[in-house]
């Protein structure tokens, strides 16, 4: 039983479907330092072409707390603050090639946060998908550009999420 689990874990790390060499926020508007864009660069490491790449992440401050986005502009009672974000890139993405994508806007106050991924989903051309939960043991396989953070999801401002 233990050998089977170890074998599965080794198999998962060997068959990484996508690897991110860049996953970070940068200031998108020098007049408003809380207006951020997410810049990503990834390589398809799968032998199959990808249709979509989804990344689920949370912004994290310098002390490891998950932080919420801010709402700018008019008041909208239907908009919720959230600590959890989802981006997806639409392919096709060819095997063994690299791609750069930008996502925005994010309005996050305070010092520039770190976008910290917790799940990746890849959808393949022709059907099928894989879900990867990002862990301390596999973060360098999928996000070698990031260090592991023990994220505290309970501290700080608590919206209804």
Predicted regions and their residues:
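Short acidic/proline- and small/hydrophobic-mixed sequence motifs that coincide with surface turns
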Residues: 47-52, 66-68
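Surface-exposed edge beta-strand/loop patches
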Residues: 108-161
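Cleavable N-terminal signal peptides
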Residues: 2-4, 14
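Short, solvent-exposed loop/turn segments enriched in Ser/Thr/Gly
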Residues: 32-40
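Sec/Tat signal peptide C-region and signal peptidase I cleavage site
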Residues: 10-16
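Short aromatic-acidic-glycine turn motif
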Residues: 31-33, 59-71, 77-78
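Short, solvent-exposed, Trp/other aromatic-anchored flexible loops in extracytoplasmic proteins
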Residues: 72-130
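Asparagine-centered strand-capping/turn motif at beta-strand->loop junctions
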Residues: 41-49, 61
